[in-house]
Amino acid sequence: MTKHNAKNERIKRKYYIYLKEAKRLSEKSIDNAATAIAAFEQSTNKRDFAGFHIEQAKKFKRELNEVNNPKTGKPLAKATIRTRLNDVKAFFHWLAGQAGYKSKISYSDCEYFNQPANDTRIAMAIREKPVPSIEQIHHVLSSIPSETIIEKRDRALLAFTLLSGMRDDAIASLNIGHVDLDKRRIFQDANTVRTKFRKTHNSTFFPVGDDIEAIVSEWIDTLKTELLYSDGDPLFPKTKIGLDENDQFAATGLTRDHWANAQPIRDIFKNAFEAANLPYYNPHSFRDTLTGLGLRLCRTPEEFKAWSQNSSHEKVMTTFMNYGKVEGHRQAEIMETVGKQGAARPDNEPDAQTIAVVLQHLTKQAKVDEKGTV
């Protein structure tokens, strides 16, 4: 097997610069593209990209469907295959316009990287995600001990994730000063906070209970009064590793550094849920929990629009499509309730709440009309 192809490496380097500077992709997205292209090269034994043939694309698709995920030992998910094929297709589409490749690669040949239609439908299907209930989260929080500084941090981390609805990577990079307890607001400054698409965003605490808010408030007070941290220090600092009394490496406290990524947060969540004898729910699932809560609490389109914006979504449909799926058991409950409501109100008679809202609107409108005729 060929170990290196200098020509391929040069053009790949040029492509990655294009992705970063022209397409403005993140390092993570570029790494994913590089992984997919490397897999294609392995399939062709690192042959020159200029010698691309549609049979190579067909062979690559077959191999992706035959290979197993190294972590699970199961076949790759259709969604994973779709992403890898699209990454390689995008590369060859770009390559077809580059000097030295134009006459050898046609744009139409790139279409051979398309996934079969049935597989694409499987990859794009919306599946019911495991979502924790508010009660389950409360149970986990009550199960976490809060004796050591690390335990207090971990407990506050779960509480803050529910209170803020923020993504885990953004939380990992948040400073103490970004949280205003008096105004119940969070300033997600994209200059320092790793927000999605690096958007600066102001948000307000979600109405999840005074007890949740108290845990976060006590944690910030601990950071400032006991550890003497300032506003520029991390809200959730890294664990400090040192030697314990047995000269073994162990957690000995906290540093003044941020976590480099969100993996430590996910590990904390995993350990907390397992300790509470509950299945693991990742940090992002809390956003689904909050959306479900919003669907129950919000009574007007304007209220849910505000709820959606507080989740850093510019469009309400993003919240509905990605987070607003009604779980199966809840769907059954709603349908049963709707049926009973219909039976209780013959001849389409409106319920008392609807009547009250209509009367309030008519009264307000009458006052406006009255002023206009004076």
Predicted features along the sequence, with ranges:
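Alpha-helix N-cap/helix-start motif at helix boundaries, enriched for small hydrophobics
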Residues: 30, 88, 157-158, 165, ...
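Basic, Lys/Arg- and aromatic-enriched nucleic-acid-binding interface segment
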Residues: 134-168
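Conserved tyrosine-mediated DNA breakage-rejoining catalytic core shared by Y-recombinases
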Residues: 173-217, 221-227, 231-233
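Catalytic-site neighborhood detector that most strongly recognizes the C-terminal catalytic loop/helix
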Residues: 311-337, 343
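C-terminal secondary-structure termini that scaffold catalytic or DNA-interacting sites
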Residues: 2-3, 336-374
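N-terminal core-binding DNA-recognition domain of tyrosine recombinases/integrases
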Residues: 13-28, 34-126, 143-146
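Short, basic (Lys/Arg/His-rich) helix/loop patches that form interaction surfaces
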Residues: 255-309, 313-316
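Active-site/catalytic core of tyrosine-dependent DNA strand-transfer enzymes
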Residues: 209-278
